[in-house]
Regions:
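Generic hydrophobic transmembrane alpha-helix motif, especially the helices
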Residues: 109-161
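Non-cytoplasmic
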Residues: 22-30, 211-241, 260
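Membrane-cytosol interface at the C-terminal ends of specific transmembrane alpha-helices
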Residues: 144-187
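Hydrophobic alpha-helical transmembrane segments of polytopic membrane proteins
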Residues: 154-162, 231-273
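Transmembrane alpha-helix signature in integral membrane proteins
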Residues: 61-95, 209-217
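Transmembrane alpha-helices
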Residues: 11-16, 194-227
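Transmembrane-helix boundary motif in ABC transporter permease subunits
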Residues: 80-110, 122, 224
Length: 281
């Protein structure tokens, strides 16, 4: 029942965000709050002739039909980026505590964590341009009429923020767990590093990972708008922000939320299968 109420409140919250541009108007240089106009527009959007439709120039288009293609691009970008972030952060987090310069890498990750997303996008675009000049290989297109040519440059760029966050969390927790008595006892017994990593470290690290999954996905979705816009990706960012209309904005935000939920479920399933196969299997 709590899940139903959370879902209901989430939908209401998304509708409020989508209606925000309708609540504010500028008249004679002054900002006016107009809840009546917003409520009227929302009510009108549920009329049979306007429900789940939006205007594109002089054409009336179906929102469900168009949101699928936009959502596919965003879904692929979001899923690949989060999975890549988990793979890289697990490898780095595992290796960091076995190197002498782990503290320096953690400090570097802490510094990078305050860098805005658009800076990473800028350097990714700069790298793609230099690569094209040197090799003739074109990875991206900066033309507003052409989509980006390779999904992997945006994927790697979008994965930077969650990767940095996860590296800091995993490395810190690994360092704490290595000082626990049960780990020291296992080492004293001569158990293999692989056994200790899987049965003692991973199992005690997993609750922290599950607790931070939502934050990781939220960080990635926050960066998603910047990456899609600057890389000129035909995704839900364009669907939502180009030519604002309440219905398509509300549906676009809802689809992004559902994609985030799908990625969350996928990651939990992967962690569950990893434990069953690698530890219990």
């Amino acid at each position: 029942m709590n899940v139903v109420w959370k879902g209901f409140y989430s939908i209401i919250f998304l509708l409020l965000i989508a209606s925000f541009p309708l609540l504010i108007a500028v008249e004679n240089g002054a900002i006016t709050f107009m809840p009546g106009q917003a409520l009227e527009t929302i009510q009108t959007s549920f009329l049979p002739e306007k429900f789940m439709k939006y205007e594109l120039g002089s054409e009336i288009r179906s929102i469900p039909h168009d949101v699928v293609s936009f959502g596919m691009n965003t879904g692929i970008l979001l899923t690949y980026s989060v999975l890549l972030a988990f793979i890289i952060s697990f490898l780095f987090g595992y290796l960091l505590n076995r190197t002498s310069f782990s503290k320096w890498i953690r400090r570097g990750a802490a510094v990078l964590s305050v860098v805005p997303d658009f800076v990473f996008v800028f350097f990714a675009i700069l790298f793609a341009i230099q690569l094209y000049r040197a090799t003739g290989i074109r990875l991206i297109s900066l033309s507003p009429t052409r989509p980006t040519l390779s999904i992997w440059v945006p994927v790697f760029t979008l994965a930077i923020t969650p990767t940095i966050y996860l590296i800091r969390i995993i490395a810190l927790k690994y360092e704490e767990l290595l000082t626990e008595d049960y780990v020291r006892t296992a080492l004293a017994k001569g158990l293999s590093k692989r056994y200790i990593d899987l049965h003692h470290l991973y199992r005690n690290l997993k609750p922290f990972l599950l607790a931070d999954l939502k934050k990781v996905i939220s960080l990635t979705i926050g960066s998603l708008f910047v990456v899609e816009f600057l890389f000129n990706i035909t995704g839900l960012t364009k669907f939502i922000f180009v030519d604002y209309q309440f219905q398509k904005t509300a549906v676009g935000l809802l689809v992004i939320s559902l994609l985030g939920l799908a990625v969350y479920i996928l990651l939990r399933a992967i962690l569950y299968l990893f434990e069953k196969v690698m530890i219990d299997g």
